[in-house]
Curated annotation (Swiss-Prot):
Role this protein plays: Transferase that catalyzes the transfer of sulfur from thiosulfate to thiophilic acceptors such as cyanide or dithiols. May function in a CysM-independent thiosulfate assimilation pathway by catalyzing the conversion of thiosulfate to sulfite, which can then be used for L-cysteine biosynthesis.
Organism ancestry: Bacteria, Pseudomonadati, Pseudomonadota, Gammaproteobacteria, Pasteurellales
Active site: 63 (cysteine persulfide intermediate)
InterPro entries: GlpE_sulfurtransferase, Rhodanese-like_dom, Rhodanese-like_dom_sf, Thiosulf_sulfurTrfase
Keywords: Cytoplasm, Transferase
Family: Belongs to the GlpE family.
The keyword DNA-binding is annotated on this UniProt entry: no
Swiss-Prot/TrEMBL GO biological process terms: glycerol metabolic process
Domain Rhodanese: 15-103
Alphabetical list of PANTHER family matching this protein: FAD-DEPENDENT OXIDOREDUCTASE, THIOSULFATE SULFURTRANSFERASE GLPE
Name of the protein this chain belongs to: Thiosulfate sulfurtransferase GlpE
Predominant location: cytoplasm
Any Pfam family hit: Rhodanese
Compartment annotation: Cytoplasm
Gene (UniProt): glpE
Length: 105
């Protein structure tokens, strides 16, 4: 596997050290709630992401349950990013770990 899998708690700790967490869920779900400080990565926001992250930046990919994040993590590695992680359990795991979220409710 060209990337590592980490727990939501590890992801939060890495974010405190400057890692970028990207949430790849759909627009409505992201707008409703997402991990605090997450960047919403979509096809439309990819150019903005490229300006935000350099190839050595630690990047954590989060999805719904930790499955589709693996595909995006692989894609990012193929684009040249060297420090990529997939978050086990996705946003569901993040919520179960009771980590901070940004929400509209």
């Amino acid at each position: 596997m060209p990337f590592k899998e980490i727990t939501p708690q590890q992801a939060w700790e890495m974010m405190q050290q400057g890692a970028i967490l990207v949430d790849i869920r759909d627009n409505m779900r992201f707008a409703y709630s997402h991990p605090k400080g997450a960047f919403h990565l979509t096809n439309q926001s990819f150019l903005q992401f490229e300006e935000l992250a350099d190839f050595d930046s630690p990047i954590i990919v989060s999805c719904y349950h930790g499955v589709s994040s693996r595909n995006v993590a692989t894609f990012l590695v193929e684009q040249g990013y060297k420090n990529v992680f997939s978050m086990i359990g996705g946003f569901d795991g993040w919520c179960r770990a009771e980590l901070p979220i940004d929400t509209t409710y």
